[in-house]
Amino acid sequence: MPTNRNEEMMVYCSFCGKNQDEVQKIIAGNNAFICNECVELAQEIIREELAEEVLADLSEVPKPQELLHILNHYVIGQERAKRALAVAVYNHYKRINFHDSREEDDVELQKSNILMIGPTGSGKTFLAQTLARSLNVPFAIADATALTEAGYVGEDVENILLKLLQAADFNIERAERGIIYVDEIDKIAKKSENVSITRDVSGEGVQQALLKIIEGTVASVPPQGGRKHPQQEMIQVDTKNILFIVGGAFDGIEEIVKQRLGEKIIGFGQNNKAIDENESYMQAIIAEDIQKFGIIPELIGRLPVFAALEQLTVDDLVRILREPKNALVKQYQALLSYDDVKLEFDDDALQEIANKAIERKTGARGLRSIIEETMMDVMFEVPSKENVKLVRITKEAVDGTDKPILETA
């Protein structure tokens, strides 16, 4: 029996036996109580088990040739870029496994983030997405132009990490081994003597903010997004094992490369050509060119792997329409098959779709919108026409001079 009223009102944790005076907080449940210390202990046990599961998932990372084989199923062309990405991604996750098992005096492997340079619609984002999907790791995309340095209206760089956490269902251990793709990095190039007026005035500040999370830091992430404030509880995310893939079109960088190569040819003679006739200027880009474009050297140093993507040709775009596992032609054929209708594209129709994408300078990303324009009336009318069994898309249907051909049973 309790000897006094205070003892009668005392609450004890059902797990460790401590009373309310010995801990910060006790939570009441159905016929049981738990203290904050036991909650924290349980969370730590769960975190350790989840971390072990994540490590087990990454212990058998596909070899570079296997990754390339996976990419080839979905991505047409860009052979050099695919090889560079396959090697970089394999080495990154091998480094994580090595780091988690290494002895104290072993060599420390540094992280190798990736810089992808290529025109709009050449497949930069899709390559990063495909890699993340093939590895089954969380993936997030961020637009560098939406980011601002501290004190300005806009997104903090920590919000990039929030997107990754959301992709990982707020499993911190999984998020800390995910992939982040930062697009439009060229649009925040710092001002220089040869800079376009469209570049972000505060670009260098944003680059500095990105540098911190890319090189590896423990960042405080607001779980609800937005700006930080003192009352908001933060999630701590260690970025040292997050792979950052940074991409941009870098319009005009070819001129910087040409100028550099021209100076070398003048200075050392025609026999010392720095570029092969069959190699494009994009493949000849070096760190010096990127720095001259307006990316700070510290950030370039944290992006040691360069992957240059070429402008896609008409033939490339036709192959993209036809060949990948998720090719657009196959997708639209599947859509119409649900209405028991077969869909066919003439060869010159696919050529015309590719030509339109080239004219619009949208690359592969513009192909879907062109097909949508061509097939809008078909997809509206055909489901209501029970006797239609075949739709044939001709060149004239694509260029708008005629309608798609409908064949009935």
Swiss-Prot record:
A GO CC term assigned to this protein in UniProt: HslUV protease complex
Binding site for ATP: P119, T120, G121, S122, G123, K124, T125, F126
Sequence ranges assigned to domain ClpX-type ZB in this UniProt record: 1-54
The keyword ATP-binding belongs to this UniProt entry's keyword annotation: yes
Protein name according to UniProt: ATP-dependent Clp protease ATP-binding subunit ClpX
Protein family: Belongs to the ClpX chaperone family.
Keyword Transmembrane carried by entry: no
Pfam families listed in its UniProt record: AAA_2, ClpB_D2-small, zf-C4_ClpX
Swiss-Prot/TrEMBL keywords: ATP-binding, Chaperone, Metal-binding, Nucleotide-binding, Zinc
GO biological process, one term: proteolysis involved in protein catabolic process
Top-rank taxon, per record: Bacteria
NCBIfam families: clpX, PRK05342.1
Gene3D superfamilies per the UniProt record, alphabetical: 1.10.8.60, ClpX chaperone, C4-type zinc finger domain, P-loop containing nucleotide triphosphate hydrolases
The species this protein was found in: Streptococcus gordonii (strain Challis / ATCC 35105 / BCRC 15272 / CH1 / DL1 / V288)
Binding locations of Zn(2+): C13, C16, C35, C38
Function statement: ATP-dependent specificity component of the Clp protease. It directs the protease to specific substrates. Can perform chaperone functions in the absence of ClpP.
Molecular function GO labels: ATP binding; ATP hydrolysis activity; ATP-dependent protein folding chaperone; protein dimerization activity; unfolded protein binding; zinc ion binding
Record note on quaternary structure: Component of the ClpX-ClpP complex. Forms a hexameric ring that, in the presence of ATP, binds to fourteen ClpP subunits assembled into a disk-like structure with a central cavity, resembling the structure of eukaryotic proteasomes.
SMART domains registered for this protein in UniProt: AAA, ClpB_D2-small, zf-C4_ClpX
CDD domains membership: RecA-like_ClpX
